[in-house]
Amino acid sequence: MRILKIIPQAFYTSRGTPLSAYHRAKELEARGHEVDILTYGVGEEAPDLKARVFRSIGPHFKRSIPAGPSRLKIWFDCLLFMNLLLRLCLRRYDLLYAHEEGALLAKLAGAIFRIPYVYDMHSSLPLQITDWKFSKRRSVISVFRWVERQSVRGACAVVAISPAVERAARSVCPTARCVVIVNHFETSNDVSADEAANLRMKYGIGPQHKLVLYTGSFVALQALDLLLESVPRVLARVPEAVFLLVGGSDPEIAELRAQAERLGVASSVLFEQMQPQRAIPAYLAAADVLVSPRVKGINPPGKLLPYLASGKPVVATDTLVHNQILTERCAILTPPHAAGFAEGVVAALTDPERVAKTLAEATQVVASYCSPTARDAAYADVIAAASAAGRNRNVAAAAPNGA
């Protein structure tokens, strides 16, 4: 099948929706489909991807775009839609595969060119407006609720990245054809002991230290302030603990470093800029504990399954963003506050019996979401829905009144 993926993001970057979209493209390619990508005019070159990447042309005004909703993003989406129409004039596709609000663009363009679309739903659009503090105005939230409703109802299939996202789609349209495909970022876990030791040495972390690692974006939604507030409590009981946070920009790191200094823990907290995805397995191998302090949202962090597959204990807040994937059997779940999170980290560092039990179950959770058989079946369901929708549109077009 010839597929045009619509990615309303700075593609490529090694986190969030762009990273999810990248791996979706690779999985579609691996299943024999021809994939083109249409995205914003900003972003990096994607590694090891067969797909052709077409970037929006037009006045973008900025060379980068922040994560989350913004007025600039709305303008970028307008440019993306004009470029989508142009692309569809130049080439025929069997399916439009759209991420996030790109589904509305796909619905409009698909109606003109008689092409079905799949909505890859990463979260609830109106919920993002409030979680990212873009606007509190009811009129603005209502507009995004309408966009989500139109996107779900018109899609031949909705690919939800988690069970909670699937529930959000069905709340909009109970009859929607939904398939849950949890983000699974394929990386090699074949990291030698020497590589892990060298990475620890790079940051001055000796064998006597216990390394607590966070990887991912540093946006406020990730609740890294909560993580830092937990550090003094952890150090009071495990003074050899060291925290390494990987994935920030210089301004983000400066802000969090200032918080660490105010808390008096700057000497025990290290920061690193965003790293390429291929480098992350070495960080996971070097760590003693992996953490995810996020509280808000319904879209699980993409790091969860790589965390579980790493063979290291995982500590996360016991909130919907995590507990739709994680349970107390495969991870250490904590109340969503600093004191509770600190207790979880301390348990991961000092309770080997509990850790052993979670690691055994983590392997089963990864297998349930990431087995080739399960993912093949999920993608086959999506493609079957797209094929059926394409046939129906062709029949309608061939009917006497179909034109």
Segments and roles (model prediction):
Residues 328-339, 347-353:
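Conserved acidic donor-binding segment of nucleotide-sugar-dependent glycosyltransferases
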Residues 48, 191-205:
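A short helix/loop element that forms part of the nucleotide-sugar donor recognition site in Leloir-type
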Residues 164, 184:
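Carbohydrate-associated surface elements
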Residues 353-384:
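A charged, aromatic-enriched C-terminal amphipathic alpha-helix characteristic of glycosyltransferases
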Residues 23, 82-89, 104, 108-112, ...:
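Membrane-proximal helix-turn-helix segments that form the acceptor-binding/catalytic region
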Residues 254-278:
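Nucleotide-activated donor-binding/catalytic signature segment of Leloir-type glycosyltransferases, i.e.
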Residues 74-79, 116, 127-151, 195:
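Nucleotide-sugar donor phosphate/pyrophosphate-binding loop at the beta->alpha transition
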Residues 156, 282-299, 312:
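Acidic donor-binding loop of glycosyltransferase active sites
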